[in-house]
Every structure is written in C-alpha cells, then in structure tokens.
Amino acid sequence: MRNTLLKLILGGIGAFMMCPVNAQVDEFSSWTGVKVSYGITSRLKASGHLEFRSKDNFKEADRLGMTLGLNYKMNSWLRMEGSYEFHYRNVSGRPWKARHRYKVGATGSVAWNEVKFSLRELFQETFFRGEVENRLRSRLKVSYEPEKWLVKPYYSTELYQPIGDDAFFTAARIRYRPGVVIAFSKQYALDVFYCRQYEPKGSRNIVGLEFQLSF
C-alpha cells in the first residue's frame, strides 16, 4: 500500500513536470528561507520566517522578507492563523521599496493512513506604493508522511483570486508546487521544492530551499 501511494504522488508530480509550457518566455527564480516555530502552549504556536528571493534567471535580487505569525489549533482537523509580513523589494530600475502585508485564515486537514490532505483559505491584504491589493488564496495540498521515513513528498496547488472588483472569478496567480521535506529530526527539517507560478503577464520556474526549526 505504501509503495502504491508513493507511486501515485510521484507519478502525478512527474506528469505535471512533463506537461508542455505555454509560449510565454519563462523566468527562473529562487527562494531561500529559514523558518522557526515555537510552541507557546499545546495549541498555540508562534513562528518567524526570513526569506531571500532572486529573479531574472537568478541574476537579480527580488526581495528580502520577514514574517511573524501565530496559529491556533482549534481541534484535531482545524487550525486558525494570522501573520504580518514585511518585504523590501527590488523594483527594477527604481530604488528598493518597502511593502507591508497581513494574512488571516484557516487550514482544515484530514488523514488517511499516512496520506494527509489539507485545504487552506487565506485572506491577504498588501500595502505597496500607496496602493492596496486584496487576494483570496486557496491551497489544496496532499502529502505522504510515513513516521519512519526521512524524506516525505508532497504536492500543492494554490489559487490567488482578486477581491473587491468584478474579476473575483479570474486567477491572478496559480502556483503548482511539488517538493519533499527531509526530516532530520523532530526539531530540524529541510523543505526542497520546485514551484511553477503562472500569472497572466508571464510564468516563473522557482527552485526553493527552506530550513525549518521547531521548538
């Protein structure tokens, strides 16, 4: 059963990776980050995240980011969360600019044997250069998490929808993300992933590493 489930997940990832891309010129980027989580109580956790992103085929810095957040476990299947983000962005041809963002949302999850399914809904509001942008983010994720395995694969799809205008039923952004979490111990892990990001103006191929610490 384990081998069958693993083949299904990896097969789906492989099929996605082999899909033909559109005719737009794609850009390659990288995301590198460190995330620290701390359990305040058995239900409440605080987290901090530092991240660096590149763009233009790894030639330019895109942004530096910091996130502070809280999440609360309501019950065995529902978790609430909220966070604040600060970005220092490289606006090509202009001075770097600061951007502020907050997010609130919830994640519901269920497990079947060692396969975990989750659906996350987030409201996101961003303040940048005197403008406000609102988005609804919907992410569906499936992961295979055998307790004794060091490497645990996952795949997620996330949809960004505009809020506050007639374009709600359009996709401002879609992210397809296969990856693996390498669990060195209960406290230390490394998330290695590829993300295909689609936007109407163009697409990005993103490779990422995130070091995770839990206390």
Can you say where each PLM-predicted feature lies in the sequence?
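Bacterial Sec-dependent N-terminal signal peptides
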Residues: 1-28, 215
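Outer-membrane beta-barrel domain signature
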Residues: 22-25, 54-59, 91-97, 127-131, ...
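Start-of-domain marker
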Residues: 24-81
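Residues on the lipid-exposed face of transmembrane beta-strands in outer-membrane beta-barrel proteins
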Residues: 34-38, 68-72, 104-110, 138-144, ...
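Transmembrane beta-strands of outer-membrane beta-barrel pores
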Residues: 50-56, 84-90, 110-114, 123-127, ...
